[in-house]
């Protein structure tokens, strides 16, 4: 079995009215322009079948507009009904909206398997953000993983890179060691610091996905991450439609069968409670 641990789908209404949604949501504005590829569930399923992928996590973004968050959550939940065997639904919320806790509980009641993808840029205030901390408490109560975008502190700039640097992500883990976190893009490099015993000890509930790996890192990062952290904590993820599925899968060809079984199957089955 191959599970893609991070993809994105959006309703067609957003594709047709891109500029309208860019005006109302700052994260959407950061990530999307006229050249950004947006797909609906049917296109994702088609590409999954072509590339032998059995299941995919479908996630939102770190919205700053509550109504947009609801729209995308509803679409992901509808897509789950249409493709119950293929879609692993996640929900996302505006971490500054007082209505987000209610929205999260609504999505949990409808069967989401996790929260995310969240994009956190206001690093100075987020650790003391009451709404965000309540979201973490709800996630902990329901044993739900939280996908958070990780940003590399050096390297090339790109749309939506953000400022969720390893130093901040580790502070988040320190304060919330019982929560299950999945840090995208190998946590912006946080995975490498698990070679330090004190970091590894505190990060026992932290996982790392490989979203957009061909855009960010050489393929050797899979083996490097396994050696730095654990074979049990690395998740294959494409970030489709940003990156072609075939290209992402090709990057893993050199891994051993047991390494592939962990990143494709064993690890996501465990963390997503499949």
Task: Map each language-model feature to its residues.
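Catalytic pocket-lining loop regions of alpha/beta-barrel enzymes
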Residues: 113-114, 126-235
């Amino acid at each position: 079995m191959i599970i893609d641990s991070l993809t994105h789908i959006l309703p067609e209404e957003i594709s047709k009215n891109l500029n309208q949604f860019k005006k109302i949501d700052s994260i959407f504005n950061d990530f999307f322009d006229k050249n950004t590829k947006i797909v609906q569930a049917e296109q994702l399923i088609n590409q999954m079948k072509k590339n032998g992928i059995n299941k995919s996590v479908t996630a939102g973004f770190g919205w700053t507009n509550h109504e947009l968050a609801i729209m995308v959550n509803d679409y992901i939940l509808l897509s789950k009904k249409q493709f119950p065997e293929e879609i692993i639904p996640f929900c996302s919320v505006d971490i500054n909206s007082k209505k987000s806790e209610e929205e999260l509980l609504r999505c949990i009641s409808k069967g989401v398997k996790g929260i995310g993808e969240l994009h956190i840029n206001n690093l100075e205030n987020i650790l003391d953000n009451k709404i965000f901390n309540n979201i973490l408490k709800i996630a902990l109560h329901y044993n739900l993983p939280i996908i958070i975008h990780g940003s590399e502190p050096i390297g090339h700039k790109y749309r939506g890179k953000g400022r969720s640097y390893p130093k901040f992500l580790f502070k988040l883990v320190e304060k919330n060691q019982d929560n299950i976190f999945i840090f995208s893009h190998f946590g912006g490099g946080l995975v490498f610091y698990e070679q330090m015993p004190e970091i590894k000890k505190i990060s026992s509930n932290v996982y790392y996905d490989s979203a957009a790996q061909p855009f960010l890192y050489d393929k050797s990062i899979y083996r490097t991450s396994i050696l730095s952290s654990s074979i049990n904590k690395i998740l294959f993820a494409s970030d489709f439609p940003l990156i072609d599925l075939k290209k992402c899968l090709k990057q893993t060809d050199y891994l051993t069968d047991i390494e592939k079984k962990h990143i494709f199957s064993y690890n996501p089955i465990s963390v997503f409670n499949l």
